[in-house]
Structure formats: C-alpha cells, structure tokens
C-alpha cells in the first residue's frame, strides 16, 4: 500500500453516530488458511476488506486457489468471499508475500496436510516484539512432520499422513493452537491439544472446521480433542464480529465525550473490555441490534490493566486504552505480559503532550488537562488506532504518518469516523 497520512482536527465534535462492526480479522485470516484443506467452494460472509485479507488472498492464489470478492459497498464491512482450493499446485510461499503479514505462518499446517510438504518464508507484520514460531514448529513435529529452518524459510515435509498425538503447550499461543488444530483435523487417529488458546476467534475457526466435516470436541476450553477425518468439504460460514474494532470505536467515543452505536456486537462479545470501558467512565448498553457506548461520567477515570490471554485483557487493546488514559483524572498503569516492545506508541503520544513513561513491561500514564496536535508516526497497527484516538481528543491538528498500517486491521476507518462527526482526512 502507498504510504499515507491521516490529518485529524481534534476537539471539535464528540464522536456520535452508528457504525456497523466488521468481521474479525483475527478470525478471518485463520479461516481463510483453513480453506486450503477443503474440497469444493467455501462461501465466507462477514469478511473484512483489509490489507491482511488481501495478502492472504494473494497467498492462496499463489498456491493455485481461486478467490472472488463480493463487496458490501453500503456498509464498507462484512463482505462475502468465495474460495476454491480444489486445484492447488504449489507448496512454497515466497518472502514477498509472507513478509507483509505474520498470519502467513498459519498456512504451514494446511499446506503440509494438503500437499505433503510446505515451504513458508518467515512472516512479517507488525514489529511488536519477539513472536517466534517455536511452538508452531514443535506442534507439527509432534504430529510427525519433519521441520527445518533454512535461512529465512521454514520447510516442512511428511512421508505420509500426519499422526495424532498429545500436544501439551507450555504456554498459551493463539497461532500455535490454530496451526496444530488445522494440521490435526485430517491426521490419522486422535489428537489432544492441552493448554489450548480459548479466544473467540480460535473457537470460530474450530466451528468452521466442524461445519466442513471435522470432528472436534472441547471447543472453547483449554483441551481440544480432534479425531482425524479423510476429507473436508467447503461449507458456508459467517465470521464473528471484531471485538477489537468495536472496542476501538468505543474508546473514540469515551475520549471525545461522545456516544457511538455499534451494530452487530454485544457487551458479552466484548468480554472484559466492557467492564474496563465502564471503569474509565463509559456506559455500555445492549440494544436490539448491537450496543451503545457513551461517556457517562464528566471525567475519564484512570485504569490499571494487565494484558493476558483470553479471557484476560487483550494486548491488542492496550494502546487504545493508553491513548484514552492520557486525559484521565489520575495515573493509569498498563502492564504488558503477552508481547515485549509493545509501547512504541509512547514516544509519539509524548509529542502530543502526554505524560507517559515506560519501564520494562509497564507504562505509567499521568493524565493531563489537554493534548495538542502534532506530527506523529504510527509504528504498528494498534498504535495507529491509539494515535488516531489521541488526535480526535487533542486541541489542534494532528498528522499521523505511516498510517497505512491502520488498514491492516480497520476498514475505511476515517470514513466511518467522519460519518460520526470527526474531522479526519486521508492524505496519500
């Protein structure tokens, strides 16, 4: 994507309006990868039109798959995609594709299962610390694959079908759980995955595979049991809505003292985010077609957050909460326990007048009376969203460069915010 900037005029209008929640990127990408396992065409509804989805489409096409995209131009969300992988003819994915998206590593298990071998360049995506593939590789080896890392490539092969086994992860990993699950669904015998990730997006992948004919029990628990089947056939499936996107728009409303109606999600789907939004001074109310989030208290309250695997507080939301906490009455603390080096946004918020200090895995944020517009640079996807929230509540104009990272996770965000009264302009 061409380098772009956002020009944000803050402190003009509170965010107020209706936004339709999109399908979850963190569900869409592994489900697209799982389509590599299936016979026949798959129809996926609720698909977000994001840069990462485009890259995954290019990846599947490079292997011989066919993809057609039917866009929902009215809502600019929840599109339909048809994927057919009947005629795969390639098992190697070049660095030009994988360097753009970390989720490319999720294709290791499916390609290996389908083709008997896989070669995937080490993935890219946001630079938010060390996210090694060790657990992915270990799980595939447990299933009988031969795996070696040669330079920048992971090479996998198997002499026959993978064989079911017991995979006991030493720590919780969403990606490794998903890779192991996809590799196990057509393995010979039974596989048990212990200490599995239980994020809603992992459960969505499992439910999709069950629709395709997989035999999986324990969905939504720390122990998954998979009985391998001979083949899987393409179902229709609707991707769950994006709780990270919904939480981001909710914080934009709280930061600006506004109100946003988010269609398609519930407070239950937000999980602990709903509790933390209310703790900051917001009010979260379920309505027939979604929920309404508004600023309930006259001031923003400080928070203490500890990121953790689901059902704990998601690491993907801490930057946005940090931006909102910059204007809180008091001192907030955010403790990052999932990824290292995920406070790269702190220096940029400080340019806007934030009183934020990072020591180790903890950011301390003392609320200030106001933020001021500045020229800042977005270091990664969620930091982009955080800087946009800060810009909306700052006085003056904020210019956010490198904002193309934003569109890895948020579709037409500036258009949706403009419809809610924000003054936001995309500059290419």
UniProtKB/Swiss-Prot annotation:
Keyword Transferase attributed: yes
InterPro entries referenced in this protein's UniProt entry, alphabetically: Enolpyruvate_Tfrase_dom, Enolpyruvate_Tfrase_sf, MurA_subfamily, RNA3'P_cycl/enolpyr_Trfase_a/b, UDP_GlcNAc_COvinyl_MurA
GO cellular component, one term: cytoplasm
Known pathway: Cell wall biogenesis; peptidoglycan biosynthesis
Secretion signal, residue range per the UniProt entry: none
One annotated GO molecular function: UDP-N-acetylglucosamine 1-carboxyvinyltransferase activity
Alphabetical list of PANTHER family matching this protein: UDP-N-ACETYLGLUCOSAMINE 1-CARBOXYVINYLTRANSFERASE
UniProt protein name: UDP-N-acetylglucosamine 1-carboxyvinyltransferase
Source organism of the structure: Anaplasma marginale (strain Florida)
